[in-house]
Amino acid sequence: MADSQRLPVVETFHSLQGEGHHAGRSAFFIRLAGCTVGCPWCDTKHSWPAQGHPEQPIDALADAAQIAAEAGASFVVITGGEPLHHDLQPLTQSLDARCGLPLHLETSGVDPLSGRFDWITLSPKRHRPPRQELLQACHELKVVVHGPEDISFAAAMASKCEDDTERLLQPGWESSIGEALAVEHVRQHAQWRLSLQSHKWLGIR
């Protein structure tokens, strides 16, 4: 874990949220380095090792978020890697003080929750199940689908979430089986929605 006043950062950028409930909205992304979850299909494996990525002061990240807010960003997304490998309380405090935008978290839920967030997207993994506190705290449950076992896993995870939690299935990128399974499940279960990686279709970050 880094010094709580500095965090290893892969990148920051202002783009559109490509996935989930808030897809299509302008957002400022802070991608933190470090992840031990190790999903085989991960499209940001370069973010796994915390070493090699520069540690940046949290106040500098908050200042960058404020610049993005002035340029039209409607919220901040803290992602990774696995951002909860780090203590996020100092970062969210700085963002609240300097930026004021709503704060969103994208996590697999394997670590305790830290920091204050307006929206939590939980994307649990079968090989590293999430903590119960994240299942209950999340606003959005998003499960990546590659095969039928992921549909069963999604149902099991949803049963542990609050009733008003958004439930989304996201086909694995270039997974025709996952796509067919997710579409059919959503068609038959009104409480689920389909999530697509629209940023990849658009060719943006």
Predicted feature descriptions by range:
Residues D3-S4:
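Short coil-to-beta-strand transition motifs
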